[in-house]
């Protein structure tokens, strides 16, 4: 249904944001 679709999209967005934050932290810690 619509709710499950929204949840799926939200999970995808959250994963992308988390990945970007991790990459940023790695850059700050180890250098890019």
From Swiss-Prot:
Keywords: Amphibian defense peptide, Antibiotic, Antimicrobial, Disulfide bond, Fungicide, Secreted
GO BP annotations, alphabetical order: defense response to bacterium; defense response to fungus; killing of cells of another organism
Name of a matching Pfam family: Antimicrobial_2
InterPro entries reported for this sequence: Antimicrobial_frog_2
Record bears the keyword Secreted: yes
Cellular component aspect of the GO annotation: extracellular region
Disulphide linkage map: 27-32
Tissue specificity of this protein: Expressed by the skin glands.
Subcellular location per the Swiss-Prot or TrEMBL entry: Secreted
Domain of life: Eukaryota
Family: Belongs to the frog skin active peptide (FSAP) family. Ranatuerin subfamily.
Function (record text): Antibacterial activity against Gram-positive bacterium S.aureus and Gram-negative bacterium E.coli. Has activity against C.albicans.
UniProt-recorded name of the protein: Ranatuerin-2Lb
Source organism of the structure: Rana luteiventris (Columbia spotted frog)
């Amino acid at each position: 249904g619509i709710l499950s679709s929204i949840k799926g999209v939200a999970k995808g967005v959250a994963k992308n944001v988390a990945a970007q934050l991790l990459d940023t932290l790695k850059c700050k810690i180890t250098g890019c």
